[in-house]
């Protein structure tokens, strides 16, 4: 009986984690490099859609959406940091990060 309760609990937790994934899209390189962000497709106006640039999340209804002209690090899914982020650095962003930091999009 204890085993069945444990299995039921694990299945419930797993289903909650999976169902919450659509609420938390993550940046993907192809989309970020095109100046977009990965979002639920129903949240992006047609004229801003950039299909196929969030391939890892496509099955969950997530795709690339061009961002508004506001060009900030956070609007591209980035974070201002002093860490070395290699190819994840957004060099083409005219970002708002403080001096001595760079905009990195962690994938």
Curated annotation (Swiss-Prot):
Entries under SUPFAM superfamilies matching the protein: Defensin-like
GO cellular component: extracellular region
Compartments where found: Secreted
The keyword Disulfide bond is annotated on this UniProt entry: yes
The protein's name: U-scoloptoxin(19)-Sm1a
Leader sequence segment: 1-20
GO molecular function, one term: toxin activity
Stretches of the chain forming a coiled coil according to its record: none
Swiss-Prot/TrEMBL keywords: Disulfide bond, Secreted, Signal, Toxin
Organism whose genome encodes this protein: Scolopendra morsitans (Tanzanian blue ringleg centipede)
Family of this protein: Belongs to the scoloptoxin-19 family.
UniProt superkingdom: Eukaryota
PTMs per UniProt: Contains 6 disulfide bonds.
Tissue expression notes: Expressed by the venom gland.
